[in-house]
């Protein structure tokens, strides 16, 4: 059955027509997935029509992709429609819920106001009633329960408790002001049903009293409000719509990604299967049968389609699901195999048992047959076997009886221990109360009763309740009687009826008195609990403590009330309750602080552990990196050694060949007679070197002279390098000084801006004060003069700033020119570095060349040995593959070649001499150019010095301007003081208003001029920015010129290289490998060009990435600035609203004053003048506001309306603003929910974030490794340079070898006395050849030195290039900052549009870059930055939404106030139109300004709409990002689950393997035992067969004897026949008896076997039962409640534990009864841990989601 349960599972249900992905074995070797359309399916098999991979043409594939794009676009449209409908439904549901909440809130507020209006005296009368009405009691209980959120109040509280609660001061106010929406009342339906009954209805409450009626209404409205509020968050319809929206967004995202990839592939084109991007399928008619378990998933493809295209994401998802399916199938197969093995094992056991029974049956049958033929003497065998069987049974039953007794004893012990199990639970059963007594020995019990009566009572009740397994309230009527020797206690116990009084007494006597003993031992310890409360109350009320000793708290309260110290018992109890609550509050605060400390310590420990782990991982990584670096260095060293060896051997061979050629030419030998097509073999010894010594000395002297010249050049170059480094340092200092000056300039600009703001504020103050002191013409003239002075100072400061800006721009241009120069030199250095990188390839070529030289040398030796006229060389020839030492080569005689072109060679030598002269001239020109460069450097240093002086002067000028500005600020302060002094004279100058109006208008004109000047300054700043751009263009031109210069330098370097190549050709001209070397050189040049192109492309890519990063940073900075500007605008709008409110209040006051003054005709003119002045002030203030908001004023000019329609338009706008505010509230709610969801997602994706951080850390490590690799490459380049120096040293060593050869030549001179004549004839030619060789060597040395100088220059240029790049980056940043400053002066709306367009472009660029750089390590950092930016943008957008909502509210209030002002102004205009036409004109102006404000509001509304659209876009992006994060989280979870499953499967496999190994061992042992038993059985069978044959033979003999005796008896005597008959009868009887005996014996044996088998099972069951009973016994002993305190001192340790209690009322218990909760928990914890309660420390309670 178990195997059947494992096999039978619910199969996957598929419908015909569905497209599925399924697994199959390709070629029977590996798994492969494919698509198929379901044709039919049954329980285990599915028939599909297979889809094949499209192998058609590109046109077909493009057609498939286009059709797939159309399908995905249709799906996206469906998703969009579903999304819009879901959003509409969600908005409707939320609107409905919010309307319900607002209505319920309005009713609740009315009820609250109604309750608040009830008189406190009336409420006191209600609560002072002794027998109130039921409706009053129920309503007061409901109010108390609802305010405290405690349902037990309605069931457990008495009228006295309710009176106590309502007599507290401000109790009603506290109750009705409770947070109803904060906590949901659990039993709201019960209250509603009870209060809606007829006897407790609102009518009954209104009949009772007004207070009860108002409270009744408050309770019902509060419950309705609570229900409506809870509906906001618990409405399942909202979650359904949110899920639908999330599904739609996810679907849209998938469609969008697929469409993007399809479009990319469609644009790119390609083969039918693009490696990893797309996979195209075509439906076929081939039908396959596949098992149902091989189905991976259902693919979302239209069944009617004939073609489909899947992206790599969809394919990856299918592959992941396929892997999961395979793992599940493997797991299921392992379960099946395990179940099969178990069934097979069980079947094998049954077969073994059956075979054993069969053997026993056969054995018994044989015994029965054998017994039939035994003699009569053996008839007692069954009886003997029966006796033996009985004895065996008794021996078997004996342990059974012993085990039964043991089990019985164990059961008795377990029963006894289970009766004392400390984990008992009380059950509600019928109870009975019995009287009991208990005594405790001790002499100090009277002291305990006197000092701690309450603690003694609680301890005794707790202990006896635990002993009797009843609650504490079941221990009643406790009476303590203390004597000199013991404490006698009598008490009642309410226990279940099934327990008798004797059992209770037994429990009481057996239970250890731990708590009472501790009380007796700790009698002198401080009091606690109610005992301590009694002492504190006595001290608080100045009562004597000894008068209340031995009293309980209840008696104490009664005694205190009787003493009359406190007349009002209720007040006294309330004060005591307040004191106790204060104590509990203090204790709770201490616990919370302790818990906070513990949490902080735990967090600190966790952070420390994580930091240590990170450090350890970093150490390990560093160790690995160091090991890898060491390994690479060793490898590089080996390669260098090999290259050095090969280079030295090659140089020796080249030198030997060159010398052989020269000496053969000197000897004027004949040409080689051989094949002209092949290179001749050099076979002639050169012992005629006697006269070469002088020439060699000359060569050495010439080399020494050239070496000194090169050393001088190197020293000069070092000096130039030192000067360049000094210049670069000075340049860095100058750049730092420039940066500091730029920072100071920015600070000065900020200060100037602040001063301009101060000036604007001062002008506003002046205008306000001038409106009040319009008569002071002389003072106004002075103020005008001061303003002119300020303007002049400002102009001068601005002129100085502009001059500085121009100087700085010039300095920047110069620096950029130098930067371009260094960039060009850097390019040359890069080329040289690439040349060094190709040296390894040259090493390989040199090795091939060396092998060729070795082969040529061996051939030369062979040919020389074959030549009869030549003397053979003494050295033994070796194979050319073996390495030949340099000493051996140098010791061999030199061999020359046959040169029939000797005359041509001489001619060429002369030509090369001329070319060398030209090279000397060019070298001299290069030295001259170097000197010119040195002079230019000195000029640059002088210019830098002058620039530093100019910067110093500019700094001094800035300081002077700063002092001037401080003086101006002091003057401004003085002006402010003078203005304050002049305000006192305002009252006397009211009559001179008309004169001062013209002056004010002039000032306004001047202010406008100042604003225009500021605009001109802004335009000038823009012009400066354009000039900077022009300068940048000039710098680019200079860069191009520098590039040309660099190209010339490159040409010169190429010329030098060509000359060096020519020199090398001159040295190696006799070789026939010139063509090959030229080809190799061309290939190297091509490689260099390719490397240069690659380097340029890499630089371009790096520049593009840097630009993108800078653009991202700039965009982030611009967004932050926009947010700050929006905040500033919001603040300005708020200020404007406040000022408009103030003006509205002033206008109301003005209207009242006009109404009052209307009756007074004489004062009408004066009042009108005052009103005109006030209106002028209002107009001026509005003009100032318009000046402050010029950008907004330009937008507000579009909607000018008439005075009569303004009110209607404002009302319409107010309605629109209200709608927008509601929409914003909805959006804010949605954003809040999205923020909550984001927080949840962030909480869920913390692991992903950590993994991403780990990945980012790994990528950073990889980047660092790459940097290390780059540094190592640079080190390799430096080492190559060192190797070049070493090669030079080897050249010197070669020169030494030449000297040694010269010594050998001298020895040869002694031997060459016979050839003196020939030597004399060849001396001249040898001298000429030696001169040519020396000149060639000098040229080669000069070229090498020039190459080294170029390398040094390249290194210097690299450094300078790096510095210049840094400076260029800084200059670019400065230019970008200037451009940003210029761009900030544009309009806000244009900026927003541009930012939106830029953001879209950046989004597209980022997507393209993300697609291109998916495999780069920087993508993770960008993704992390994008997530952080999105989170910041979400926060910013939420803040903007809140601010916009506030602005809308303010604008609505402004619109309402403006409408009221318009109505007032219209009334005033109608009244005063007839009297003053001028006043009407001024009011019209004011109305026009108000129209501008209305237009401004409309513009703000439009901006809000734009913001809302942006917020929606951001929300969509956020949803997309959230979906991506969810996808990543799901993938990570799947991977984690897969890893866990794999780990579990591995563990299971390991465990299964171990089990199988153990079972195999057991099986082997069993097989061995069975084999032994089988052998024994075979032996027994043989023995039995022998016995049977013996018995048969004995029976035959016996039969013969009996027949003979019968014959004798018959023949002897017939009388014996009767006896024979009688004996036969007896024999038959005996045989029958034997048969019956055998049958009974067989039955008894079978019974014995069955009994033995049953006894074996019983014994095993008894053994397992005994083991379980022993375990239970140990467990019960561990949890026995009869434990006692240890008498010996043991080592103690403190551990921290957490216990969770379920429930939803723990918070109330924590706040209301903390001490009771603490004491109960301490008692339970002490009993559970078997320790005293004083060892339970640092207990803290935490309410977390209604669990503790």
Swiss-Prot record:
Cytoplasm keyword on record: no
Sequence repeat start-end pairs: 1012-1025, 1026-1039, 1040-1053, 1054-1067, 1068-1081, 1082-1095, 1096-1109, 1110-1123, 1124-1137, 1138-1151, 1152-1165, 1166-1179, 1180-1193, 1194-1207, 1208-1221, 1222-1235, 1236-1249, 1250-1263, 1264-1277, 1278-1291, 1292-1305, 1306-1319, 1320-1333, 1334-1347, 1348-1361, 1362-1375, 1376-1389, 1390-1403, 1404-1417, 1418-1431, 1432-1445, 1446-1459, 1460-1473, 1474-1487, 1488-1501, 1502-1515, 1516-1529, 1530-1543, 1544-1557, 1558-1571, 1572-1585
Coiled coil regions, renumbered to chain: 613-657, 684-864, 903-1663
Chain intervals for the UniProt region annotation (41 X 14 AA tandem repeats of E-E-L-E-L-K-[VA]-A-E-N-E-K-L-A): 1012-1529
Keywords for this protein: Cell projection, Cilium, Coiled coil, Flagellum, Repeat
Localization of this protein: Cell projection, Cilium, Flagellum
GO cellular component: cytoskeleton; motile cilium
Annotated Gene3D superfamilies: 1.20.920.20
Keyword Repeat: yes
Function text: A component of FAZ filament that is required for correct FAZ assembly and attachment. Not essential for new flagellum growth.
Protein name from the UniProt record: Flagellar attachment zone protein 1
Source organism of the structure: Trypanosoma brucei gambiense (strain MHOM/CI/86/DAL972)
